Amino acid sequence: MIVYPSIDKLLENVNSRYSLAVLASKRAHQIEAGDLKMLSEYKSPKTVGMAMEEIAAGNVTIDPDSLMLEKDAEKMDKLSQKDGE
């Protein structure tokens, strides 16, 4: 259960719960891999909690360009699968 930051605070910075889950997961993996932390202090000892605190602070956002590239890659993959049939 998420107590801090609140889901309402998190959704101010991310447009859906699904996007929030994906963003928090990706950022948590980055923190675990040794990426620099974006806040000087965290309330949560866990990386997912740290990621959510960074999202609530507005330090982590979804890059719209990467979303477009991802969608384009999915379309190209589907087209290449059709061509191979």
UniProtKB/Swiss-Prot annotation:
Disulfide bonds: none annotated. It is an enzyme of class 2 (transferase). It catalyses: RNA(n) + a ribonucleoside 5'-triphosphate = RNA(n+1) + diphosphate. GO terms for biological process: DNA-templated transcription. GO terms for cellular component: DNA-directed RNA polymerase complex. GO terms for molecular function: DNA binding; DNA-directed RNA polymerase activity. It holds the Pfam family RNA_pol_Rpb6. It comes from the Bacteria. Signal peptide: none annotated. Its EC number is 2.7.7.6. Keywords: DNA-directed RNA polymerase, Nucleotidyltransferase, Transcription, Transferase. The RNAP catalytic core consists of 2 alpha, 1 beta, 1 beta' and 1 omega subunit. When a sigma factor is associated with the core the holoenzyme is formed, which can initiate transcription. Belongs to the RNA polymerase subunit omega family. Promotes RNA polymerase assembly. Latches the N- and C-terminal regions of the beta' subunit thereby facilitating its interaction with the beta and alpha subunits. This is DNA-directed RNA polymerase subunit omega. It comes from Latilactobacillus sakei subsp. sakei (strain 23K) (Lactobacillus sakei subsp. sakei).
